Amino acid sequence: MTNSAYPRTDLGADQRGGSPNFPALEAQVLDYWSNDDTFRASIARCDDAPEYVFYDGPPFANGLPHYGHLLTGYVKDIVPRYRTMCGYKVERRFGWDTHGLPAELEVERQLGITDKSQIDAMGIAAFNEACRKSVLRYTEEWQAYVTRQARWVDFDNDYKTLDLSYMESVIWAFKQLWDKGLAYESYRVLPYCWRDETPLSNHELRMDDDVYQSRQDPAVTLGFKVLGGDDEDLVGAYLLVWTTTPWTLPSNLAVAVHPDVTYVDVRAGDRRFVLAQARLTAYARELGDEPEVLATYRGADLLGRHYLPPFQYFYESARNAFQVLPGDFVTTDDGTGIVHIAPAYGEDDMATADKVGIVPVTPVDSNGCFDATVPDYQGQHVFEANAQIIRDLKNQSGSAAVNGAVLLRHETYEHPYPHCWRCRNPLIYRAVSSWFVAVTEFRDRMVELNQQITWYPEHVKDGQFGKWLQGARDWSISRNRYWGTPIPVWKSDDPDYPRIDVYGSLDELERDFGVRPTNLHRPYIDELTRPNPDDPTGLSTMRRIPDVFDVWFDSGSMPYAQVHYPFENDDWFDGFDSADSDKQVDAHYPGDFIVEYIGQARGWFYTLHVLATALFDRPAFKTCIAHGVVLGSNGQKMSKSLRNYPDVTEIFDRDGSDAMRWFLMASPILRGGNLIITEPGIREGMRQVLLPLWNAYSFLALYAPKIGTWHTDVSHVLDRYILAKLAVLRDDLSQAMEVCDISGACEQLRQFTEPLTNWYLRRSRARFWDEDVDAIDTLHTVLEVTARLAAPLLPLITEIIWRSVTGGRSVHLTDWPQANQLPADPDLVAVMDQVRQVCSAASSLRKAKKLRVRLPLPKLVVAVYNSQRLKPYIDLIGDELNVKQIELTDAIDTYGRFEFTVNARVAGPRLGRDVQAAIKVVKAGEGVANPDGTLTAGPVVLQPDEYSSRLVAANPEFTAELPDGSGLVVLDDTVTPELEAEGWAKDRIRELQELRKLIGLDVSDRIRVLMSVPAERADWARVHRDFIAREILATSFEFGEPADSVAIGDGVRVSLLKV
């Protein structure tokens, strides 16, 4: 275990005891790793090992890292460390997400740009150059941050989505989709950001909870007058529609009803209104409590009726418009049961209008403002125009006066409304031309391949991710922007000679354009043009469409684009040897592991899966952790303005990275829950694990700083127990880490620190004082193995402990402990754990009755099944609890009784009506427990999972229950004068031991004592004189009046001299 190049040194000598300065210790480790190049050594030692493929999702480097990155980064460090110790080679290549609107918006902010026209004025080349510089602005800060959190990554071999090689793989992927018929252009209604002047994909609206924000909008109920036709019964009546987007009313081209809904024609004053019968009560204020119903119709009866639109702008030009159409999407949950249709501004609207050949009208420009086709509102932003549109309808002024639409109700409607996840402005829905991936063509296959992925938490597979896949829609991948990978589509500029060319490589571009691009970004790629080969006149030109890819297409291409596949590394990626096509080698696709927060189920996880299915017909990854969200101290989203979270750097400087790592990793957040960051929570993690481990190491360093070796062949029961307990920890940690249950692994480690420090070390203290070799070697072995087991979870503190104990180079260059290295003894573990439970329960009784630990008590009854197995440990229990007599018994029912409860939810489906009879019997206390674990409850027998039990003490004042109802302990708290005297002596022993420490004596130093005792305590002191002397290592112990004395307690004064 030792190495002369790395001699054993007490690395934490100045930090032992009290309160170690963990940040200072961590700084030592980080410096050591840097100088030793330990990370590269950990990779190199596995050069010939099988690989474990980890995909590191690329962050943006134009902003500083936050708690979300910190949390995910810890997981990205823990899993590769564990897999490396298990014998795998795990490359940890860092990547940077550099394209897209996040980068553009940051540059716009820096340059004071407020709209796209300013970008066009400055020039695309200049703007994109500013983006290129901006996206890598904080790389040094990122590297410092990642290094400080003790995360090992390869920055030197990083990839960037702006690299030419990366972008070539991205356009290759699109060309593959095009060749498979899975990419197409279409005119559709999409979520649209008027601030950024580009559409979004539907999955971007579902990534974060805060994309939908509560918003108040004006809602209007409006009547459109029915025109004459073949049926005259409704002429002059008003079709009532309800909308929360009044700005779309100038674009109205139809209304929709549900064919199977019942509608009524009612009279209100001198007007008639048509609406769904189910919505009458909602409009009682306007129509009356019992309006006169003139006629009743099915929705199907209303189809084809024509009406006058609320505005005249498109009345003459729109074909097949202004009629009642069928719509299965129409409901009677709100509104009137009749839906206003503006095809350019609603998905259902466009689909409904398309069926009858209604061509959408689009009077709103790319900035979200009305154009000249609606002169009354020209230049007004749609949200600002709402107020004037409503005023005109109410006052029957302007264009709204022509067709006589009736404004029946104007109200404020509060509802969740989508906002741009990048600029945070409210979106609109708008018909635009976009390029799509035909996800619906292979959606079922995506659902099938999802079953091959292991998800943590497990419910994500068929829950949030699986359900999203089932409803997946075609993905809009084009963005009307500048800084991104260009969509490699060239079109003829003459519609009379149409042609589309799609390119998937630099070679293909060079072949057709005669030049090999060295930069695929705009505007350089836009400059590649050529004559249209299909135009015999030779006048038309092939020009690239101006769009760039959705940034999620970039990141979804990461597995292959990072290695420039298929242009390079195809053997590495696919797992075939180029020299021998029949020889299979390690494939690097799919990846073995990825992790991000749960929102990526509709972001990166989703786009990875889409492209993997479409391109390779397999998943992109085998295992995925989708963790919860980190919240501020007030339970809300973290906010710099609210200052509702502690500064990460301050936590690192005060508590250290391992403390933060433990707090995050041990929490429920890795099982899908959310986590509130609190400083007390971080410190509690230190108290639970870091300090106990450090104190155990300090204990060994104090008593045996230069000795101790690996040793498991021991005879003392406490040594055997802690080694067997360590074997259990090894198995439990291995099981948890194999399934990426990191929080479960943390819990196992936390549970181990209790028996290690509060049982083994405390019960073995005297053996260490005596320099017992077995005890020293056992603790050495436990610390060496525990450091290895905890190394992925606490890489910094374990490095110090392991190197100090062994003298080795690094704990992170060791192997994961094997099962056969440690002696397993499940029987000993079970019985000693029960001994500890007995002691814990009895100690709780002492505490509740305010009986100090050093006061002896006469008797403890331990009532448990198979109580005799505790007999060898009676002395240990008595000594631990300071109780004179331990009585063992199997007669639990003498001291308590079991109360049973039927689990009706589990038992009901099997028992039917009999479950009620069982409940009645059990409530009456007549249930009978059977040896096989079943419970007889009257006419039925309940299985173990169909009921629960609770052990209730007969005399709770003196009785405590053991965990899981396994037994009871009953404490006799009678205190005799003899017991009180012994307790007094033990109190003085503790005070004298503290005095020894105070004056700086070594634990082995002998002393002489002169003690002055009050007269009423003199007899107690004489009786227990030898006992006190022996415990404090006094070779001389006399009574008298010391000249130079110290008061220690209960009127006692002493003088103490080293021999």
From Swiss-Prot:
Its cofactor is Zn(2+). It comes from the Bacteria. GO terms for biological process: isoleucyl-tRNA aminoacylation. Keywords: Aminoacyl-tRNA synthetase, ATP-binding, Cytoplasm, Ligase, Metal-binding, Nucleotide-binding, Protein biosynthesis, Zinc. GO terms for molecular function: aminoacyl-tRNA deacylase activity; ATP binding; isoleucine-tRNA ligase activity; tRNA binding; zinc ion binding. Gene3D superfamilies: HUPs, Isoleucyl-tRNA Synthetase, Domain 1, Valyl/Leucyl/Isoleucyl-tRNA synthetase, editing domain. Catalyzes the attachment of isoleucine to tRNA(Ile). As IleRS can inadvertently accommodate and process structurally similar amino acids such as valine, to avoid such errors it has two additional distinct tRNA(Ile)-dependent editing activities. One activity is designated as 'pretransfer' editing and involves the hydrolysis of activated Val-AMP. The other activity is designated 'posttransfer' editing and involves deacylation of mischarged Val-tRNA(Ile). IleRS has two distinct active sites: one for aminoacylation and one for editing. The misactivated valine is translocated from the active site to the editing site, which sterically excludes the correctly activated isoleucine. The single editing site contains two valyl binding pockets, one specific for each substrate (Val-AMP or Val-tRNA(Ile)). Monomer. PANTHER family: ISOLEUCINE--TRNA LIGASE, CYTOPLASMIC, SOLEUCYL-TRNA SYNTHETASE. This is Isoleucine--tRNA ligase. The gene is ileS.
